[in-house]
Swiss-Prot record:
It is found in: Membrane. Glycans are attached at residues 81, 239, 243, 247-248, 254, 257, 536. It is a multi-pass membrane protein. Residues 199-227 form a coiled coil. The lineage of its organism: Eukaryota, Amoebozoa, Evosea, Eumycetozoa, Dictyostelia. Belongs to the TrkH potassium transport family. Pfam families: TrkH (PF02386). It comes from Dictyostelium discoideum (Social amoeba). This is Putative potassium transport protein DDB_G0292412. Residues 106-145, 223-261 are annotated as: Disordered. May function as a potassium transporter.
Length: 648
C-alpha cells in the first residue's frame, strides 16, 4: 500500500511519466532495489525527495524499530491487563518450564508436533481442560483461582543456598528460582502462597528453627538467673558448717567456690557467642527476604529487563542512523566542495554538490542504488574518497549492521552506569531483537562477508583482464573498482563501470553473487532464531532457502519469457539479459543492463522485488518478531487466550 501511494504521488508530480513506470520505480525504491525503467536524473527535486522517503521507509535498519516498539507495547499491554507476567530484571524466557502444582510434571511437545496430531479446535479445548484438576484425585479446587508454577530466571542473585537442582551453574548472571502460586481470575493477581514451593518451605523451616532457638535461649537465661541464688545458699550453708571444721577443709571449700565461678564465666561467654551468631543469622535472613521481595515486582513493567533492553535499542538505533547520515553527508559534501574536478562533474550534470551528497548518502546506506547521474557512478570511478566512503555506507546499512551493533553494545556496556540492559542484549540477542546475533553467528557473518569480497575481487581480476570497461585505468584505479564492485554487486546496485562492456563470464559471476547476496545474513538470521525449527542448523536453512529461491525466480522468468516472446524471437533481448535483470530484482540489488520490458513484465518484476525483500525478513515463528507467540501449553499463553475469548 505504501508503494502504491508513493507511485500515485510520483505520477501526480511527474505526470508525463506512464503510471506503470511510476509504480515500478516506487516499489523499486521501497524495496531498496534501485531498478529504474526511465531516467530519473531529470526529475524534479520534489520527486527525488519523495524517492528518498520511500527508500528510508524500506531501510533494513529502520524496519527494526517497529519490531522494538511492538515488543514494548506488548509488554505494557500485558502488565496493564493483568499482573501475571512480571518480574523485575526478568529474562526473556520468564517462565520456561511449566509445573502444575497438583499434577505430575511432564514435558510438552512443540506446536508443530501438536498440529500434526490434533486440529486447532481440539488444541484449544485441551488448553482449557489443562487448567482443571482430575476429579478422580479428590482434591479441592477453587474455581476462582488458577494454580500455576514455573522457573523464574532472574538476573540478580536471590539466595545462594538454593536446593540442589535449582541452580544454574552455566549461567553466571542468571539464577533460577522455582515458583508456585495462584492467579485470581477476577482480580488478575498472582500470589506466591502455595505451600508446595521449595523456597516457601525453606523459609518456614528457617522460621521454625529460629523459634526453637529463641525458646532454648530463654530457658538458658532462666537457668542462669536461678543458678546464682542456688550457689549463694549452698555457699552459706557450707561456710556455717566449715566454721566448725579444720583449716584444711576451709581451703578445700574455697577451691570449690573458685571452680564454680570459673564455670559460670565460661557459660556466660558461650551464651554471648550463641547470641551473636543468632543475630547474624537473623540479619542474613532479613536481607534474603528483602532480595526475594525486590525482584518479584509483578505490577511494574518499567523494571522488566526486557523492557529496559528494548528501550536502550530505541536510543541506540536512531543514534546509529543519524550519526552515519551526518558523517556521510558532511564528508562527501565537503570533499565535493573542496575538489575542483568533482565540482566540474556536478556542474556538467546540473546537480548541486550538497544535494548529490545528501541523496547518495541515503541511497548508499539504505542499499537502494539510485543515482542522480544517468550512468550511475561511472563518472566518478576514479574518485577514491567518494567510492570508499560510499562503500562504507553500503555495508554499514546492510550486511554488517548486526556486527557493528554488537560492537556498540559491548563498548557501551563497559562505560555506562547501567550495564545490565546491554548485557542482557548481548547474552540474549535473538530473543529480543531480530538483527542482533550471538557472538558465534556474528563472527561467522563477518568472516563470510570478507570471504565473498576477496573471492569476487580475485575472480574479477582473473576473468576481466582485457575488458574494455577498465581501459585507460591504472592498477590502483582498477583495484579500487574491483573492490567497489564486490561491495555493491551483492547488495546496493551502484556500478562504477559500464556493465555492457564487461564480458559474459563476469556478468555470469555477478548473477551468482546477486543470487546469494543475502545468504550470509539469512543464515545467521534463521540459525539464531529463538524457538525456530532451523535453530543451529545451517544445512537445513540452506535447503529450505535454496528450494524457495530457485522456484520463485524460475516461475517469474518463465512468465517474462512468455510475455516477451516477440522480443526474444527478434533478438532484441536475450534470455541471459532477462535472467540478469530478474536475479537483480530478486536479490534487491539493482544492477541493470537496460532492457526493454512490457507492462506485464514490469508487474512480474515488482512481484520479484517484493519476494526478494520478504526473504530478508524474519519468519513469523521468530519469537523476537511475534512476542505473543508462546507455546500453547504455556500458562501465560493460555490465560491471554481465555481472556480474549471472554471479550468476544
Amino acid at each position: 500500500m505504501v508503494g502504491f501511494i508513493g507511485s500515485v504521488l510520483i505520477k501526480l508530480i511527474e505526470f508525463e511519466v506512464p503510471f506503470i513506470d511510476c509504480l515500478y520505480i516506487g516499489y523499486s525504491a521501497l524495496t531498496t532495489t534501485g531498478l529504474v525503467t526511465v531516467d530519473i536524473s531529470g526529475w524534479s527535486s520534489g520527486t527525488l525527495f519523495l524517492l528518498v522517503i520511500l527508500v528510508q521507509l524500506g531501510s533494513t535498519v529502520l524496519l527494526t524499530l517497529p519490531i522494538v516498539l511492538l515488543r514494548r507495547f506488548f509488554i505494557r499491554s500485558v502488565y496493564s491487563n493483568s499482573s501475571i507476567i512480571s518480574a523485575a530484571n526478568a529474562s526473556p524466557d520468564l517462565i520456561s518450564t511449566i509445573i502444575h502444582s497438583h499434577l505430575p510434571h511432564h514435558d510438552f511437545k512443540d506446536d508443530d508436533d501438536e498440529n500434526d496430531n490434533n486440529n486447532n479446535e481440539e488444541n484449544d479445548d485441551n488448553d482449557d481442560e489443562s487448567y482443571q484438576h482430575n476429579n478422580n484425585n479428590n482434591e479441592e479446587h477453587d474455581d476462582n483461582d488458577i494454580e500455576i508454577g514455573g522457573i523464574l530466571k532472574l538476573d540478580s542473585p536471590i539466595d545462594h543456598n538454593l536446593p540442589n537442582g535449582f541452580q544454574d551453574d552455566n549461567a553466571p548472571h542468571h539464577y533460577n528460582i522455582p515458583i508456585v502460586g495462584k492467579i485470581d481470575k477476577k482480580s488478575r493477581k498472582f500470589s506466591l502462597d502455595s505451600p508446595s514451593s521449595p523456597i516457601i518451605q525453606q523459609q518456614q523451616q528457617q522460621q521454625q528453627q529460629q523459634q526453637q532457638q529463641q525458646q532454648q535461649q530463654q530457658q538458658q537465661q532462666q537457668q542462669q538467673q536461678q543458678q546464682p541464688s542456688t550457689t549463694t545458699t549452698t555457699t552459706t550453708t557450707t561456710n556455717s558448717t566449715l566454721n566448725k571444721s579444720t583449716n584444711n577443709s576451709t581451703n578445700n571449700n574455697n577451691n570449690t567456690n573458685d571452680s564454680q565461678s570459673i564455670q559460670k564465666e565460661v557459660n556466660i561467654d558461650i551464651n554471648r557467642i550463641d547470641s551473636l551468631q543468632e543475630l547474624q543469622e537473623q540479619q542474613e535472613h532479613q536481607q534474603q527476604q528483602r532480595q526475594l521481595s525486590k525482584p518479584l515486582n509483578l505490577n511494574s513493567y518499567e523494571d522488566n529487563m526486557e523492557y529496559r533492553s528494548l528501550g536502550k535499542l530505541l536510543v541506540i538505533i536512531p543514534c546509529y542512523i543519524i550519526t552515519i547520515y551526518i558523517l556521510g553527508f558532511i564528508s562527501i559534501g565537503a570533499y565535493i566542495a573542496g575538489s575542483e574536478s568533482a565540482r566540474s562533474i556536478m556542474k556538467a550534470n546540473g546537480v548541486n554538490g550538497w544535494w548529490w551528497s545528501l541523496f547518495h548518502t541515503f541511497s548508499a546506506f539504505n542499499n537502494a542504488g539510485l543515482a542522480l547521474f544517468s550512468d550511475s557512478l561511472i563518472q566518478i570511478n576514479e574518485k577514491y574518497f567518494l567510492l570508499i566512503t560510499l562503500s562504507i555506507l553500503i555495508f554499514l546499512g546492510n550486511t554488517l549492521f548486526p556486527v557493528f551493533l554488537r560492537i556498540i553494545l559491548l563498548v557501551v556496556s563497559k562505560f555506562t552506569k547501567d550495564p545490565e540492559p546491554y548485557r542482557n542484549l548481548l547474552e540474549n540477542p535473538r530473543s529480543i531483537f531480530t538483527h542482533l546475533f550471538p557472538y558465534k553467528e556474528t563472527v561467522q557473518l563477518f568472516v563470510i562477508w570478507c570471504i565473498f569480497n576477496v573471492s569476487q575481487i580475485a575472480l574479477m581480476a582473473l576473468l576481466d583482464v582485457n575488458d574494455k570497461a577498465f581501459t585507460n585505468m591504472n592498477y590502483g584505479t582498477i583495484l579500487l573498482n574491483y573492490y567497489f564492485s564486490s561491495i555493491s554487486t551483492r547488495t546496493c546496485g551502484f556500478n562504477s563501470v559500464d556493465l555492457n562492456l564487461l564480458s559474459e563470464s563476469v556478468l555470469l559471476l555477478f548473477v551468482g553473487l546477486m543470487f546469494v547476496s543475502s545468504y550470509p545474513f539469512i543464515i545467521s538470521l534463521r540459525r539464531s532464531a529463538v524457538n525456530n525449527k532451523y535453530s543451529n542448523q545451517s544445512r537445513e536453512v540452506m535447503k529450505e532457502v535454496l528450494i524457495r529461491d530457485i522456484f520463485v525466480p524460475y516461475i517469474c522468468i518463465l512468465f517474462i519469457a512468455i510475455f516477451e516472446s516477440q522480443l526474444l524471437e527478434s533478438g532484441v533481448i536475450t534470455v541471459f539479459q532477462i535472467l540478469f535483470e530478474a536475479i537483480s530484482a530478486f536479490g534487491n540489488v539493482g544492477l541493470s543492463i537496460s532492457i526493454t520490458l512490457s507492462t506485464y513484465s514490469k508487474l512480474v518484476f515488482i512481484a520479484l522485488m517484493l519476494a526478494g525483500k520478504h526473504r530478508q525478513l524474519p519468519e513469523s515463528v521468530d519469537e523476537s518478531v511475534n512476542p505473543a507467540l508462546l507455546k500453547k501449553n504455556a500458562v501465560i499463553s493460555k490465560i491471554i487466550t481465555r481472556y480474549k475469548r471472554r471479550k468476544l
